Amino acid sequence: QQYCESLEERTTADFDATFKTNVYAMFWITRAALNHLSAGSAIVNTSSVQAFDPDAIVLDYAQTKAAIVAFTKSLAKQLGSEGIRVNAVAPGPYWTPLQVSGGQPQEKIVSMGSGTPMDRPGQPVEIASLYVTLASDESSYCSGQVWCADGGNGTL
């Protein structure tokens, strides 16, 4: 995720790299894993609230996260009869190393998450259990869903 103020500033190489990182890699890893999955297995992808309510400065990133939603829902339909569940998590603003490495305009980092009802960004530990639950048998009848964790904005 690298912010970009204008479509004209985004190069084809940057656009391609974002898709290769977020969409192609997920496709290749999932395809490679399929031979190792059996009934009761779970795939949990990472999308983003940007798939549903994109900021102007993350145009290519938001597109990839929307593609992950479609991939998740479609693959859940393909694999359901095999007993393999496919879901996604769509985080809102979370504090990660990505934020300080160009994922956000640096002047906006201090106010990151202030637009949520919780008035702060989430911490990775606050979303980890969602991934664990979706991967566990506790979610055995949950597939094709996107679970949002966005500090109360109710994106989905």
Label the predicted regions.
Residues 48:
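Residue(s) in the substrate-gating loop at a strand-loop-helix junction
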Residues 30, 64, 72:
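Active-site helix of classical SDR
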Residues 5-7, 11-16, 112:
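Substrate-binding pocket helix/loop in short-chain dehydrogenase/reductase
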